[in-house]
């Protein structure tokens, strides 16, 4: 019919879940409605489970609180952090989709230099659906982006690239700084928009931030454990970075790629640097040993699945990091519990995206 328009189906509409950890009403979703409404949301409520979290009308979502987590996982719920955004990884576990996008509730829609709203989810999907180049660096960054290609001297034998497991997005406005840097630069804002996506080279670690992150759950999901943080733990704000160090070791071993760069979101508010310092204090010292450990970690050739790799890594954590603090013994045990819980909710041999959502609390489905 003349003049009629057909709305295109959003990319991966039935293959992607959006995971949001929160302690507050999700009014921020109104800004994201044009981009998020077609997708299924998994909301992980942290803190007091009796508090009512209001979600704007029209979104398709499941909401899990601590009571739900305890009911679904039983004793294994001990591996899920409480009073820390690390609780988001429970959403990764109960999802049955191939892809995950996770975002914090203080992250708003950013604008590109032309003033156009950035569809962060769409860019993450493009990043994940295109190969990565972890084995040889392309000086034009992502050669698979429109308008780019492999530069002269890039080996033809390596141009197929590697499957992309992780897409790590960035932030305008409030940078993701540690507490000491926050204290020194309280007014600093990130205003630089860099139009680039690049693959992090094999053998190189990076500080992963969980506030604007997407990944292929089938490729790397079992390793996306955000550790033991928050209530009852001696450390906080290292959840995403811990996961990032682990997934990079495993991606390097399995020949998978990790991208960073676009898309940007607008990080709306800075957290309290004094509160952050209390959470980070031990981690600031511990990371000086965790990072060399991760840089030198190797996995046996017979570790061919993410679960096998992660369990092997947990053994090495217990063996080599427990001398720093008993916390690492506890963390290594939690890593094993996490894999056991993951495998219980995600039996092997079944199509992950086709499994029924058996674990969803029916009264909280929308």
From Swiss-Prot:
Gene Ontology, cellular component aspect: cytosol; extracellular region; Golgi apparatus; plasmodesma
Q: Which UniProt keywords apply?
A: Cell junction, Cell wall, Cell wall biogenesis/degradation, Cellulose biosynthesis, Glycoprotein, Golgi apparatus, Isomerase, Secreted
Q: What is its EC number?
A: 5.4.99.30
Q: Could you say which tissues express the protein in this record?
A: Expressed in all tissues tested, including root, tuber, leaf, petiole, shoot, stolon and stem.
Q: What's the stated role of this polypeptide?
A: Probable UDP-L-arabinose mutase involved in the biosynthesis of cell wall non-cellulosic polysaccharides. Was initially shown to possess an autoglycosylating activity which is dependent on the presence of UDP-glucose and manganese.
* InterPro entries in the cross-refs: Nucleotide-diphossugar_trans, RGP, RGP_fam
Q: Which reaction does it catalyse?
A: UDP-beta-L-arabinofuranose = UDP-beta-L-arabinopyranose
Read off the domain note: The conserved DXD motif is involved in enzyme activity.
Q: Indicate the quaternary assembly.
A: Homopentamer or homohexamer.
The text of the family note is: Belongs to the RGP family.
The UniProt annotation puts motif DXD motif at 104-106
First-level EC class: isomerase
Instruction: Write down the position(s) of the site called Required for activity.
Output: 152, 159
Q: Where in the cell is it found?
A: Secreted, Cell wall; Cell junction, Plasmodesma; Golgi apparatus
Tell me a Gene Ontology molecular-function term this record carries: UDP-arabinopyranose mutase activity
UniProt's post-translational modification comment states:
Reversibly glycosylated by UDP-glucose, UDP-xylose and UDP-galactose, but not UDP-mannose.
Protein name listed in UniProt: Probable UDP-arabinopyranose mutase 2
Q: Which GO terms describe its biological process?
A: cell wall organization; cellulose biosynthetic process; plant-type cell wall organization or biogenesis; protein glycosylation; UDP-L-arabinose metabolic process
In which organism is this protein found?
Solanum tuberosum
Known cofactor(s) = Mn(2+); Mg(2+)
Give the positions annotated as glycosylation sites.
152
């Amino acid at each position: 019919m003349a003049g009629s328009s057909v709305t295109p189906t959003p990319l991966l509409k039935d293959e992607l879940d959006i995971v949001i950890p929160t302690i507050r009403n999700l009014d921020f979703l109104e800004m994201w409605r044009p981009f998020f409404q077609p997708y299924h949301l998994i909301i992980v409520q942290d803190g007091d489970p009796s508090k009512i979290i209001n979600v704007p009308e029209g979104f398709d979502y499941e909401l899990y609180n601590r009571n739900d987590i305890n009911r679904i996982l039983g004793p294994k719920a001990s591996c899920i952090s409480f009073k820390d955004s690390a609780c988001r990884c429970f959403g990764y576990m109960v999802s049955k989709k191939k892809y995950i996008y996770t975002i914090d509730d203080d992250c708003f829609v950013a604008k590109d230099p032309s003033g156009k709203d950035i569809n962060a989810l769409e860019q993450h999907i493009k990043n994940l659906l295109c190969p990565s180049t972890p084995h040889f660096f392309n000086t034009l960054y992502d050669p698979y982006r429109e308008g780019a290609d492999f530069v002269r001297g890039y080996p033809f034998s390596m141009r197929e690239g590697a499957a992309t497991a992780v897409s790590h997005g960035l932030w305008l406005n409030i940078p993701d700084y540690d507490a000491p840097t926050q204290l020194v630069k309280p007014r600093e804002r990130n205003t630089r928009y860099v139009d680039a996506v690049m693959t992090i080279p094999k053998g190189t670690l990076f500080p992963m931030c969980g506030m604007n992150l997407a990944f292929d759950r089938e490729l790397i999901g079992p390793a996306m454990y955000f550790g033991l943080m928050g209530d009852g733990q001696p450390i906080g704000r290292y959840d995403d970075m811990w996961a990032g160090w682990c997934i990079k070791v495993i991606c390097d071993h399995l020949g998978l790629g990790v991208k960073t760069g676009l898309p940007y979101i607008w990080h709306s508010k800075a957290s309290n640097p004094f509160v952050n310092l209390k959470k980070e204090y031990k981690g600031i010292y511990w990371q000086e040993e965790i990072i060399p450990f991760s840089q030198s970690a190797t996995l046996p050739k017979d570790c061919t699945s993410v679960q096998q790799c992660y369990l092997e890594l947990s053994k090495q954590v217990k063996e080599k990091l427990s001398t720093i603090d008993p916390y690492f013994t506890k963390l290594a045990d939690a890593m094993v519990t996490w894999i056991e819980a993951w495998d219980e909710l995600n039996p092997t041999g079944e199509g992950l995206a086709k499994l029924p959502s058996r674990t969803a609390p029916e009264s909280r489905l929308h």
